[in-house]
């Protein structure tokens, strides 16, 4: 990915074409696997507190995502735009999948940035999605350091010395398991409108705006 100046970011390391193609086919295989899993997904429990809008809102988006998931990367801008257009909260949960080799650590780093400020955590996740095709385990830290530097921060040598952020990621993953998440992204439109449908899962990102309209 080129920067606005036309030069590649400092952290980018050119990979052999074979490695890039291998990564592409792995992503494709994961997507096909997750698609088959989602076909048998259980209906969400509308009484689960995780599937309710925050206090003061009648409508919200609840998203379970994996930072290494290609479909999550493609859905993220649409979700962001929907939140801004409808002026509704977007509640993001990290749900790193076991077949991905750097998403868990990226989620831990994301929670480190959350601790600095929630907005910084949001921006880090968006940054990782933007550069996702270039990332592999050996350069995840340098990518994260570049983000920190751009925001006038220094990423600690040990990001999570006490395991606090890993525990937060584990808690979000446990929450997803409780809800019944088995694929990413899983996107819910949730509503507290009296007499209305409380939860609607959106499986096609192109139908997100239409789904929000239906829940209003």
Feature roles, as predicted:
Residues 63-65, 95, 128-130, 156-159, ...:
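A short, structure-level motif marking secondary-structure boundaries and short turns
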Residues 2-9, 16:
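Cationic, amphipathic, low-complexity segments that mediate targeting or membrane/lipid association
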Residues 11-12, 24-102, 163-183, 211-216:
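Extracytoplasmic thiol/disulfide redox context detector
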Residues 67, 73-147:
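Structural alpha/beta surface segment adjacent to cysteine/selenocysteine redox centers
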Residues 19-22:
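N-terminal Sec-pathway targeting helices
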Residues 1-3, 37, 193:
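Generic detector of intrinsically disordered, low-complexity, polar/charged segments
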Residues 32-35, 132-135, 196:
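Amphipathic alpha-helical interaction segments
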Residues 145-216:
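C-terminal cap of thioredoxin/glutaredoxin-like
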């Amino acid at each position: 990915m080129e920067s606005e100046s036309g030069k590649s970011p400092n952290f980018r390391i050119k990979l052999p074409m074979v490695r890039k193609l291998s990564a592409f086919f792995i992503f494709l295989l994961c997507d096909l696997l997750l698609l088959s899993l989602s076909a048998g997904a259980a209906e969400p429990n509308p009484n689960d507190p995780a599937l309710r809008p925050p206090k003061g809102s009648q409508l919200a988006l609840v998203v379970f995502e994996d930072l290494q998931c290609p479909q999550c990367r493609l859905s993220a801008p649409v979700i962001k735009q929907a939140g801004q257009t409808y002026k509704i909260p977007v509640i993001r949960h990290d749900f790193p999948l076991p077949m991905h080799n750097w998403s868990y650590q990226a989620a831990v780093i994301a929670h480190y940035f959350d601790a600095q400020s929630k907005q910084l955590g949001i921006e880090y996740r968006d940054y990782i999605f933007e550069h996702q095709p270039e990332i592999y385990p050996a350069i995840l830290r340098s990518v994260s350091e570049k983000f920190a530097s751009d925001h006038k921060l220094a990423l600690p040598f040990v990001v999570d010395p006490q395991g606090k952020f890993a525990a937060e990621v584990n808690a979000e993953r446990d929450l997803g398991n409780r809800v019944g998440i088995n694929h990413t992204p899983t996107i819910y439109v949730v509503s507290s409108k009296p007499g209305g449908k409380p939860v609607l899962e959106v499986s096609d990102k192109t139908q997100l705006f239409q789904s929000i309209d239906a829940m209003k």
